[in-house]
Amino acid sequence: MNQTQPYMDVHSSHLSSAQPYASHAATAGAMAHYPQYHQQPPVLQPASTYGPASSYSQYAYPSGVASSQTAPPPPSTSMSSQVPAQLLPLPVNSHTVTAPGYGNTTGTPMQGFVYDTTGQLAPPGAKPRVTATLWEDEGSLCYQVEAKGVCVARREDNHMINGTKLLNVAGMTRGRRDGILKSEKVRHVVKIGPMHLKGVWIPFERALEFANKEKITDLLYPLFVHNIGGLLYHPTNQTRTNMVVQESQQRRLEGPPSARTPQASQPPALHHHHSMQTSIPSQMPQPPTMSSQPGARPPLDRAHTFPTPPASASSLMGLSNQSSSYDWNNQGMNSGVPNTQPLSIDTTLSNTRSMPTTPATTPPGNNLQGMQSYQSQSGYDTSKPYYSTAPPSHPHYAPQYSLSQYGQPMPPHSYIKNEMAPPAGRAPGGQSETETSDVKPADRYSQSNGHVTAGAGESAPEHESEYVQHDNTGYGASRSSYTYTTNTSVGSLAGEHSQLTNDITGSPQQNGSGRMTPRTGGGPPPQWASGYASPRPTAASSLYNIVSDTRGSSNGAGSENYTVASNTAPTYSMGGSLGSGKRGREDDDMGRPDSQGDYESKRRRTNETTVGGPVGGVLLGLQPMKAGGAMPRRR
């Protein structure tokens, strides 16, 4: 009679309120201990219906409708754990059979037993072990029968049977099994879901044929019983069966399985959503723990009522104006909120309930100091938000990096005179502004983007004065930032791309934009040698000033229409003279087609309206500004 002990010990997990079976059966030496259960009605109420103690050997399956041992489906175990103990056992016959040896486990017909090919008749000694599981993915109830440690399932709606598990019971090899199942005309392949439901599902008739062919029909009893639900609807087991069926019908009415959540985790999730979005439920037990610890941080067991804030939540929640009613350290806990009114906490944080708040609802806290310091340390004018795109790699150039590149239509003279002080090294050699205006215009005709894009309605002489003044500041600043040696012999490098005409390079200088394209960029300015007399490399240098801002401190600052400041030819043609200026003009005339007549007239007019008179006087004025006393290369 002790053969039932290991079975009951194994299946103790399926007994919801009958744990004393396992504990006593493990220690009991004989069946004499079982009459103790008759004196324990609180533990097992229906003990009087079990009969004498000897009937336990006949009832070898204490979890009659619980799931099997090897492949327990999750829904059935949860169902059986919720059912009272009096619903579990099935009434048994009076024949005495040992627990493990029911039915035919050999795979061969028993002696004296007519083999039932229909699967309707129970083999001698076999008991209908059927479990029902709700298959959520398919929305159907599944009847499950275990044989040889394999759980074979059958659907309730179309009565298809898992052929993969069926042939596994037969001990068939994988290759042969898959070959047979692939040749089936009607089959349903399931690849997602519980393990015992995966596989190839075949119709009921084909499954019965396979079972008869492999001689496993009696092993699978009652899988092929037509009214398999009747075995589940046992009178003693009626309540549990109704629970399973009602749940399956309720699941069908609820809709597709994707919209459903597991039954066990649903109520906490709903409470969590209510506590996050609406007022905190008063029936939740956590708010008293909030005020029971007035001086400490809120405990972690309040996860359902209010989330514990992250480390940086003090700036996210904007406690500058809300810390009086709720603070995470010690203010909100003892602020006089009763245990029954946790709603004040909820109302103070209603607008910042979603943790990543936007700056629209968050006052500037500590997290905004990073942006403010970024604007202040790079020296931008905070009233002009378009400065924020300036590259921060040259922070000391940032104040002058602005208006010409970011579309401010401010006139050049007003910006220079009002907003920017002249640099210290403005006129090297003690030169005055009038001398500078004498000096500049001689070579300014060679700069191809001179003032074609002058502002509408502004005359050229106005621009000349401002332009010369602006060039002088750019010249002085560029002299301080870059010291060009007088005898660098890299003229050939610069000449390779700086002598290209502006039509070849397609510069936008002639169309009035005043900006350079990367094709006209040429090379970096240190490559333009001092002895190279043509002043056109300065046109290419304007792109370098726009892009990298490593030239003068006022390069991009002056005007919308003329971005480069250090565009005077003497900056680069150090060894130039009157002849070099003439040569630049001749080259300019040769390289320019006839289609640019308007620019030609503009250029000559700026040349005619110079302040300094003849060109020779200009070259005399240039002498103090040269970097060195190098002799002219040619005349």
UniProtKB/Swiss-Prot annotation:
Location of region: Disordered: 1-21, 63-82, 246-480, 498-635
Residue ranges with Low complexity bias: 276-294, 312-325, 356-380
GO molecular function, one term: DNA binding
SMART domains from the UniProt entry: KilA-N (SM01252)
Keyword Transmembrane: no
All copies of domain HTH APSES-type, residue ranges: 129-235
Record feature DNA-binding region, as residue ranges: 163-184
Phenotypic effect of disruption: Impairs the ability to undergo asexual reproduction with abnormal morphology of conidiophores and only small numbers of dysmorphic conidia exhibiting precocious germination. Displayed reduced expression of the catalase gene cat1 and hypersusceptibility to hydrogen peroxide. Impairs the production of ergot alkaloids such as chanoclavine-I, festuclavine, fumigaclavine A, fumigaclavine B, and fumigaclavine C. Impairs A.fumigatus immunoglobulin E-independent mast cell degranulation induction.
Polar residues bias spans: 326-355, 498-513, 539-571
Listed Basic and acidic residues bias regions: 460-469, 583-592
GO biological process, one term: conidium formation
Pfam hit, one: KilA-N
Region named Nuclear localization domain: 582-605
Domain of life: Eukaryota
Key words of the record: Conidiation, DNA-binding, Sporulation, Transcription, Transcription regulation
Induction cue: Induced at the onset of developmental competence and highly expressed in competent hyphae.
Function: Transcription factor that regulates asexual reproduction. Binds the StuA-response elements (StRE) with the consensus sequence 5'-(A/T)CGCG(T/A)N(A/C)-3' at the promoters of target genes. Controls the expression of 6 secondary metabolite biosynthetic clusters including 2 involved in the synthesis of alkaloids (fumigaclavine and fumitremorgen), 2 clusters of the ETP class (gliotoxin and an unknown ETP-like toxin), a cluster predicted to produce pseurotin A, and the product of the last cluster is unknown. Controls the production of ergot alkaloids during conidiophore development.
Family indicated by similarity: Belongs to the EFG1/PHD1/stuA family.
Protein's name in the database: Cell pattern formation-associated protein stuA
Organism: Aspergillus fumigatus (strain ATCC MYA-4609 / CBS 101355 / FGSC A1100 / Af293) (Neosartorya fumigata)
Lineage: Eukaryota, Fungi, Dikarya, Ascomycota, Pezizomycotina
Gene coding for it: stuA
